């Protein structure tokens, strides 16, 4: 199938970078905008940052507007009629219109808009706003310059105006969630006629404007149904469950037991529903300890939950204490239970004064409590903000390392990996069951359990296994994607936003760097997942929990991201992958072994892109490997045929065993 071109990685900054997913209609590969396109405009690399002064930028907007000699635009009344005529006449190139997805519609077209690129200078072209994307194109350059941005990645839109030389000009600054910002300039009269700013706000933030996300309008057809990738019963069966110690429970089948948990959970066999309800009353949000993963040999388990509601008076719950004892007893290899609290000890103490808390060793005598000292969502959000400041639009080469260090981003990645390694080591080497929680059990808990499971279980390092891991530990167990990402919401300052899932994927990428042959998927796979975390093209990351997804008909009215990915696995496959089953990975969680993911965080800067087309080279290697495998299979068949023929000719003569060809590619 033809691969849809990517909006999430297109344009001046990204046109020559990775192409991680669909964000426009099916179309031939497009030329990238970059330093080689057309005549170079005056550089604007010294533009203020999005948080800096707007005065200098307004001056540049005026100059850009005057120099562009803006001549006109397409009125909103003519958009649909003109588009139909051009489509029927196959004249899309004439009007520089955007290719559309099935279900996507054009909302506004404005000609002679100026895109102020921080790397190439000002570029004049046609701006198209649809209900899914912002599409800017200049056909005068060779190759054509294209900026293709899903509206879902937009965090906020700011309008700026100025007057000079009697010529009104407008500017729009678009702050994105994927480490870039965009600046556009056009005549004031065009804004008045077409409402560019209003159109962008309306369709970039549909939920704030009483509309549905575009994923509910997207009508692409794929040969594979990605919603069938994860089946909880099948996944637990793969792990050997149920068994004598653990049962698959449907106590939450109607989401009344815990509204943020999945319908199907695994709990100790001996625990009665009444006792389970009492445990739920003692755990924040009713998120009781439930099984995530079980070791196939030792039966040591990873269970996840939320904090106990101990409070300042050290409240106890005998059912909860007995419940954790039952979890420990289910593993005959150890007489101890390790409780990993992801939080900082001081923060957990503060939570205790507010009614939360942690398990005391006096109430849980066979448990050992370990604080992993990982910071909260607000600290992580601020760290990413600092990182964006140093990677876009310009990079201070002289202070690069110290600037990266100052964001603490890699330090927080290190802490997550170190915590997950400790969990995996207790399970694998210590044969000890562990309980993992933070405050509510849907942020740091998901990071730690999924990373530990990735280290312990080679299945999760395959493409479909990783999809299962994300569906299970993140989506079904209630990571609040809608709140953490802010899908379709214009409240960019919402304190609930945080790059929790991004950190997890970054940790996975760090592991692929340390174990390049241990993962079936490649870097493009991870970037594609992150791009569509924001794009709102697919339904995979919408809503906050499983119950909400059913209420919103996400599974029936939207398409899964895995439908797209699994329909073209070669694009996302690692040619160096070797499937070592039962092989545990222990990544080195040291800053000396970690690096900033430049191909993701700095991909919009054309000067930071790798000189070699890595993705194309990987595809070629996959083709070579497939050809070599065919040749090996052919040789094996030839050897087998000769052996049979030789045996027949000798008849009753003593048999000679043929030597098999054993070749690994």
Swiss-Prot record:
Keywords: Acetylation, Cell membrane, Cytoplasm, Hydrolase, Lipid metabolism, Membrane, Phosphoprotein. The keyword Acetylation applies. SMART domains: GRAM, PTPc_motif. The keyword Glycosyltransferase does not apply. Its main location: membrane. The modification Phosphoserine is found at residues 43, 49. Residues 12-24 have a biased composition (Gly residues). Residues 1-51, 642-665 are annotated as: Disordered. InterPro entries: GRAM, MTMR1_PH-GRAM, MTMR1_PTP, Myotubularin, Myotubularin-like_Pase_dom, PH-like_dom_sf, Prot-tyrosine_phosphatase-like, Tyr_Pase_AS. Coiled coil: none annotated. A 1,2-diacyl-sn-glycero-3-phospho-(1D-myo-inositol-3-phosphate) binds at residues 351, 376-377, 439-444, 484. The active site is at 438 (phosphocysteine intermediate). Residues 90-161 form the GRAM domain. Residues 226-601 form the Myotubularin phosphatase domain. Changing residue 444 to A: Abolishes enzyme activity with phosphatidylinositol 3-phosphate. Reduces activity with phosphatidylinositol (3,5)-bisphosphate. Residues 1-11, 645-657 have a biased composition (Low complexity). It catalyses: a 1,2-diacyl-sn-glycero-3-phospho-(1D-myo-inositol-3-phosphate) + H2O = a 1,2-diacyl-sn-glycero-3-phospho-(1D-myo-inositol) + phosphate; 1,2-dioctanoyl-sn-glycero-3-phospho-(1-D-myo-inositol-3-phosphate) + H2O = 1,2-dioctanoyl-sn-glycero-3-phospho-(1D-myo-inositol) + phosphate; a 1,2-diacyl-sn-glycero-3-phospho-(1D-myo-inositol-3,5-bisphosphate) + H2O = a 1,2-diacyl-sn-glycero-3-phospho-(1D-myo-inositol-5-phosphate) + phosphate. Residues 608-665 are annotated as: Required for dimerization. The C-terminal region is required for dimerization. This is Phosphatidylinositol-3-phosphate phosphatase MTMR1. It comes from Homo sapiens. The lineage of its organism: Eukaryota, Metazoa, Chordata, Craniata, Vertebrata.
């Amino acid at each position: 199938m033809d691969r849809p071109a990517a909006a999430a990685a297109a344009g001046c900054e990204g046109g020559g970078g990775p192409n991680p997913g669909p964000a426009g209609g099916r179309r031939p590969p497009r030329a990238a905008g970059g330093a080689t396109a057309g005549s170079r405009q005056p550089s604007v690399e010294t533009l203020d940052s999005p948080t800096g002064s707007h005065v200098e930028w307004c001056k540049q907007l005026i100059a850009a507007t005057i120099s562009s000699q803006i001549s006109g635009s397409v009125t909103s009344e003519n958009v649909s009629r003109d588009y139909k005529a051009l489509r029927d006449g196959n004249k899309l190139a004439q009007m520089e219109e955007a290719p559309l997805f099935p279900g996507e519609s054009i909302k506004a077209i404005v000609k002679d808009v100026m895109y102020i690129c921080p790397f190439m200078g000002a570029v004049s072209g046609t701006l198209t706003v649809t209900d899914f994307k912002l599409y800017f194109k200049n056909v005068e350059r060779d190759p054509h310059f294209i900026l293709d941005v899903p509206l879902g990645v937009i965090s906020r839109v700011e309008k700026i105006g100025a007057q000079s030389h009697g010529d009104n000009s407008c500017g729009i600054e678009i702050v994105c969630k994927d480490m870039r910002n965009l600046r556009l300039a056009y005549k004031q009269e065009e804004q008045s006629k077409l409402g560019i700013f209003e159109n962008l706000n309306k369709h970039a933030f549909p939920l704030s404007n009483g509309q549905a996300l575009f994923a509910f309008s997207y009508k692409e057809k794929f040969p594979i149904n990605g919603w069938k990738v994860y089946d909880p019963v099948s996944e637990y069966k793969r792990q050997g469950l149920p068994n004598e110690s653990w049962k698959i429970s449907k106590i939450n089948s109607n989401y009344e037991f815990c509204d943020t948990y999945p319908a199907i959970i695994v709990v100790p066999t001996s625990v009665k529903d009444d006792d389970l309800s009492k445990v739920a009353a003692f755990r924040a949000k009713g998120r009781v300890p439930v099984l995530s993963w079980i070791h196939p040999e030792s039966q040591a388990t990873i269970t996840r939950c939320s904090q106990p509601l101990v409070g300042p008076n050290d409240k106890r719950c005998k059912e909860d204490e007995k419940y954790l004892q039952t979890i420990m007893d289910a593993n005959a290899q150890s007489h101890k239970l390790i409780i990993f609290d992801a939080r900082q000890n001081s923060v957990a103490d503060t939570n205790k004064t507010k009614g939360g808390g942690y398990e005391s060793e006096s109430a849980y005598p066979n448990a050992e409590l370990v604080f992993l000292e990982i910071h909260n969502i607000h600290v992580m959000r601020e760290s990413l903000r600092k990182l964006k400041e140093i990677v876009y639009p310009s990079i201070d080469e002289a202070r690069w390392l110290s600037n990266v260090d100052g964001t603490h981003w890699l330090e927080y990645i290190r802490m997550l990996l170190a915590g997950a390694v400790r969990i995996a080591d207790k399970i694998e080497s210590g044969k000890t069951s562990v309980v993992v929680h933070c405050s509510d059990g849907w942020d740091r808990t998901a990071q730690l359990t999924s990373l530990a499971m990735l280290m312990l279980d080679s299945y999760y390092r395959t493409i479909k296994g990783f999809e299962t891991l994300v569906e299970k530990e993140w989506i079904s167990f209630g990571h609040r994607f809608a709140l953490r990402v802010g899908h379709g919401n214009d409240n960019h300052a919402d304190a609930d936003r945080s790059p929790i899932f991004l950190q997890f994927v970054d940790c996975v990428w760090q592991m692929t760097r340390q174990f390049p042959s241990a993962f079936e998927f490649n870097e493009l796979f991870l970037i594609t997942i992150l791009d569509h975390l924001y794009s709102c093209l697919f339904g995979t990351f919408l809503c906050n929990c499983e119950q909400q997804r059913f209420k919103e008909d996400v599974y029936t009215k939207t398409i899964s991201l895995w439908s797209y990915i699994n329909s073209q696995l070669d694009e996302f496959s690692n040619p160096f992958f070797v499937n070592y089953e039962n092989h545990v990975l222990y990544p080195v969680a040291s800053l000396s072994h970690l690096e900033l993911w430049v191909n993701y965080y700095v991909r919009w800067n054309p000067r930071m892109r790798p000189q070699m087309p890595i993705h194309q080279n990987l595809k070629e290697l996959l083709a070579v490997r497939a050809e070599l495998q065919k040749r090996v299979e052919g040789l094996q068949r030839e050897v087998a045929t000769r052996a049979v023929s030789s045996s027949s000719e000798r008849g009753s003569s003593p048999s000679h065993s043929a030597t098999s060809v054993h070749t690994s590619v």
